[in-house]
Amino acid sequence: MGQGKSREEKGTNSTNRAEILPDTTYLGPLSCKSCWQKFDSLVRCHDHYLCRHCLNLLLSVSDRCPLCKYPLPTRLKISTAPSSPPPYEE
């Protein structure tokens, strides 16, 4: 007992995580490409954005996006959205 080797811990690779945008009002007219209504909590798919609701619905059906045919994002990272405009400089 106790002879087995412990597994190596795999670090989470942040390069394969999709970016989630909590609020996209500062980016201009971005919306979910599936429902075309939501503009908050958008997740970047290959070349478009999906809201989290549509992403969950699409993941329950398949692991590929029906719009771009690429794999749907399953790992997310929170982006740092600006909370205020940059400071005024003279």
UniProtKB/Swiss-Prot annotation:
Result after altering C32F: Complete loss of inhibitory activity on viral RNA synthesis
Localization of this protein: Virion; Host cytoplasm, Host perinuclear region; Host cell membrane
Main location: virion
Alphabetically ordered keywords of this record: Host cell membrane, Host cytoplasm, Host membrane, Host-virus interaction, Lipoprotein, Membrane, Metal-binding, Myristate, Viral budding, Viral budding via the host ESCRT complexes, Viral release from host cell, Virion, Zinc, Zinc-finger
Lipid attachment points (N-myristoyl glycine): G2
Xref: Gene3D superfamilies: 3.30.160.310
Gene Ontology biological process: viral budding from plasma membrane; viral budding via host ESCRT complex
Modification note: Myristoylation is required for the role of RING finger protein Z in assembly and budding.
Motif PPXY motif boundaries: 85-88
Family: Belongs to the arenaviridae Z protein family.
Function per UniProt: Plays a crucial role in virion assembly and budding. Expressed late in the virus life cycle, it acts as an inhibitor of viral transcription and RNA synthesis by interacting with the viral polymerase L. Presumably recruits the NP encapsidated genome to cellular membranes at budding sites via direct interaction with NP. Plays critical roles in the final steps of viral release by interacting with host TSG101, a member of the vacuolar protein-sorting pathway and using other cellular host proteins involved in vesicle formation pathway.
Domains as described in the record: The RING finger domain is essential for the inhibitory activity of protein Z in transcription and RNA replication. Late-budding domains (L domains) are short sequence motifs essential for viral particle budding. They recruit proteins of the host ESCRT machinery (Endosomal Sorting Complex Required for Transport) or ESCRT-associated proteins.
Subunit composition and interactions: Interacts with protein NP; this interaction probably directs the encapsidated genome to budding sites. Interacts (via RING-type zinc finger) with polymerase L; this interaction inhibits viral transcription and replication, Z partially blocks the product exit tunnel for the releasing nascent RNA product. Interacts with the glycoprotein complex; this interaction plays a role in virion budding.
UniProt-recorded name of the protein: RING finger protein Z
Classification of source organism: Viruses, Riboviria, Orthornavirae, Negarnaviricota, Polyploviricotina
